Amino acid sequence: MGKGTVVLAYSGGLDTSICIPLLKEEYGYDRVVTVAADVGQRKEEISIAEEKGKRFADKHYTLDLIDQFVDRCLMPSIKANGLYEGYPMGTSLARPVIAEAVVEIAKKEDATAVAHGCTGKGNDQLRFDVVFRAADLEVIAPIRERNMTREWEIGYAEKHGIPVPVDKEKPWSVDENLWSRSIEGGKLEDPAFHPPEEIYAWTVSPLKAPDEPQVLSITFEAGIPVALDGKRMKGADLIRTVGQIAGGHGIGRNDMMENRVLGIKAREIYEHPAANVLLTAHADLERLVLTREEYAFKQSVDAKWAQLAYYGLIYEPLWDALNAFIDTTQKRVNGTVDVRLFKGSVTVLGRSSPDSFYSIDVASFDSTTIDQTDAIGYSMYYGLQARLVRKKQKK
């Protein structure tokens, strides 16, 4: 007697495709239900996953999670200036949303287990596991559990008639969603290897970008981008539009050595044109409307938020507390930021906000609004403790 139904998070790639027969042959499940999530990747990718899921699995679901991804993950990331080790997160933000959708299908299908095709070296295994286990479901990860090699996987796929297009000359792995596109593997694993231009799909080379700059005007309400050049747009549409424009100017490439959750260093290459522009504009607007103390403290909160997001710890109570603080600060992050896009760079040209407490009368060198002699007394005691210690050290 078999083990019933298992629901598999499915991308249509090599790893998740071979999991379908493996879950039956090696794990003894009667039914394998696949779930492909649309989080803004290319439509061709979704179509391939749907076609293969319907062909090889007992049942297949394709779920449109784009709006959910935008509202639950991307907009909060903008409000938190979501950068991990200096780059905009994308994959890490999408995984929990996908995992939660898989859990819902597992409940619907009365499944006894859920599965994913993650390896034992990456971060995604942990992001899926934490959501799956929170739902009290058995978690199966065939690739991780059986320590498979790429060569073995290809052979197994061929044996089961699973078409897997793998180019040995270009064996890099690509993951994309509405916010970012990551490229890794193959020759790219050598940190000294110069990546060929052909790996990029969202951005033109800054060297070949237009010789004329383009200016965008981005309007924010409560920290969320709501309009582009004065035209209000739905979140997903605004992100797509900004991404297409910015990518055409060579903006959003990042080639870096990344510290994974397990401590492994990995060479990762990213494209995130919309993220670069929107995060730059948002951070600049915060400098206009937040107080010095708010701004300084929020930087530490943003860093912790990014770490928890990268680690996939969205059920950590601290996550809710950080989001509550961030939401409070964003009430005044309203206004418009003008940015110039030119050959790979994003430059803020100007910003305005009805919630700004900036006063040109106070800040101007030509203003007499503030009596400068008032600062004399303050200056006398500024750094007092440091001066006293310095004097003692000189004795």
UniProtKB/Swiss-Prot annotation:
Pathway: Amino-acid biosynthesis; L-arginine biosynthesis; L-arginine from L-ornithine and carbamoyl phosphate: step 2/3. Homotetramer. The lineage of its organism: Archaea, Methanobacteriati, Methanobacteriota, Stenosarchaea group, Methanomicrobia. This is Argininosuccinate synthase. L-citrulline binds at Y87, S92, N123, R127, S173, S182, E258, Y270. Belongs to the argininosuccinate synthase family. Type 1 subfamily. It comes from the Archaea. It catalyses: L-citrulline + L-aspartate + ATP = 2-(N(omega)-L-arginino)succinate + AMP + diphosphate + H(+).
